[in-house]
Amino acid sequence: MRTWVLLLAAGSGTRLATAGLPDAKQFLPLHGAPLYWASARTMAHVAGIEGIVFVFPPHRVEEERARISALDDGSVLGLDWHVVGGGAARQDSVACGLAALPRSCEAVLVHDAARPFASPALVARVLSALHDGHAGVVPGIPLTDTVKETTDGFVANTPDRSRLVAVQTPQGFTLKALSTAHETARTAGWNVTDDAALLERCGIPVRIVAGEVVNAKITTPEDLAMLDANEPQVTVPCVGWGYDVHRYGEGRPMKLGGVLIPEGPEVVAHSDGDVLLHALADALLGCIGAGDIGLHFPDSDAAFDNANSAMLLDRVLHMTHEARLRLTHVDLTIVAQVPKLSPWRDKIRANVARLLDLPVTSVNFKATTEEGLGFTGEKRGIKAIAAVTGLRPMP
């Protein structure tokens, strides 16, 4: 299902303006970029997403288009993207985003830019439920507080908390269902606070999937503490080194850096055998002192049989994010007599940069041989070496 994201960043930030902030919340800085960029990077880590439509206040469209072009230098996102102006209300902004989607789009994720901490796993959960055939999907978390309905300042009713969830974004929809719901809302004059409510009113079932407590929305001045908590103040450099080997033989088609190498020999492996991503994952784990991939994804576990190495790398990246590692550079080397990799060098480099959310200029890829010596020279296998550098918060 061809899926795009509507990243809503068109709000005026009225509640935060009362705190004297000079800009709306979606433009506040986080990790050296505007808040909305964190969500864009998250979406880029999820397989199956083809592009993003950024929806900004109309007067910010050109400014933010230029800013995204600078941030995406070297195709950091690895996705198509467009920038459009929003409307006076949230529904209007979603409608503006829908109008900018390509004709090939079949499904859409609607996400609030003020939720910068949604994880790739959460996005993938929503996307998976869409692929299962649901027309609408929303993440939700159980309520921990008792909720009261009030009238004129007095308690009127206490709903059963066990039947309530607090919903979040991204919310996923088939394009047909969401477009129909918005058209019906315009005709009927409905005004709701999220897109799932439009489907409800149209009688279209909406599936709930597990949300994340950390996926909080930056709304009030008190919420700004979450941004401060995600900005390490003092960092120290760190280095990680990774090494992996696979032998040739009947097994898996060769993949390097997530790129299929059709002329390469098959490799014997428990997972999909991407020796380059395995070495890279080990190097990343080394940077944060978290062991190696054999510890986290043992070959004795059937769950990882033919596992997608890009998925394993994404799990490792989640660990590095939790450790607040800021990756700065990656240097990768393949040692193999065959196949010849020069035709694939740029594609491998670009894909690794996309997976790591780094500029291509921060990823180096080399291929060499051992001049006919050893098992690689005898065309019996392949080696990969990875070195990564980064910055971590000072202990």
Curated annotation (Swiss-Prot):
Pfam families: IspD, YgbB. Keywords: Isoprene biosynthesis, Lyase, Metal-binding, Multifunctional enzyme, Nucleotidyltransferase, Transferase. Pathway: Isoprenoid biosynthesis; isopentenyl diphosphate biosynthesis via DXP pathway; isopentenyl diphosphate from 1-deoxy-D-xylulose 5-phosphate: step 2/6; Isoprenoid biosynthesis; isopentenyl diphosphate biosynthesis via DXP pathway; isopentenyl diphosphate from 1-deoxy-D-xylulose 5-phosphate: step 4/6. The record marks 15, 25, 270, 369 as: Transition state stabilizer. A divalent metal cation binds at residues 244, 246, 278. The record marks 161, 217 as: Positions MEP for the nucleophilic attack. NCBIfam families: ispD (TIGR00453), ispF (TIGR00151). The lineage of its organism: Bacteria, Pseudomonadati, Thermodesulfobacteriota, Desulfovibrionia, Desulfovibrionales. GO terms for molecular function: 2-C-methyl-D-erythritol 2,4-cyclodiphosphate synthase activity; 2-C-methyl-D-erythritol 4-phosphate cytidylyltransferase activity; metal ion binding. Residues 1-237 are annotated as: 2-C-methyl-D-erythritol 4-phosphate cytidylyltransferase. Bifunctional enzyme that catalyzes the formation of 4-diphosphocytidyl-2-C-methyl-D-erythritol from CTP and 2-C-methyl-D-erythritol 4-phosphate (MEP) (IspD), and catalyzes the conversion of 4-diphosphocytidyl-2-C-methyl-D-erythritol 2-phosphate (CDP-ME2P) to 2-C-methyl-D-erythritol 2,4-cyclodiphosphate (ME-CPP) with a corresponding release of cytidine 5-monophosphate (CMP) (IspF). 4-CDP-2-C-methyl-D-erythritol 2-phosphate binds at residues 244-246, 270-271, 292-294, 297-301, 368-371, 375. One of its GO terms (biological process) is isopentenyl diphosphate biosynthetic process, methylerythritol 4-phosphate pathway. PROSITE patterns: ISPD, ISPF. The keyword Nucleotidyltransferase applies. Its EC number is 2.7.7.60, 4.6.1.12. It comes from the Bacteria. Its cofactor is a divalent metal cation. The gene is ispDF. It catalyses: 2-C-methyl-D-erythritol 4-phosphate + CTP + H(+) = 4-CDP-2-C-methyl-D-erythritol + diphosphate; 4-CDP-2-C-methyl-D-erythritol 2-phosphate = 2-C-methyl-D-erythritol 2,4-cyclic diphosphate + CMP. Transmembrane segments: none annotated. CDD domains: CDP-ME_synthetase, MECDP_synthase. In the N-terminal section; belongs to the IspD/TarI cytidylyltransferase family. IspD subfamily. In the C-terminal section; belongs to the IspF family. This is Bifunctional enzyme IspD/IspF. Residues 238-395 are annotated as: 2-C-methyl-D-erythritol 2,4-cyclodiphosphate synthase.
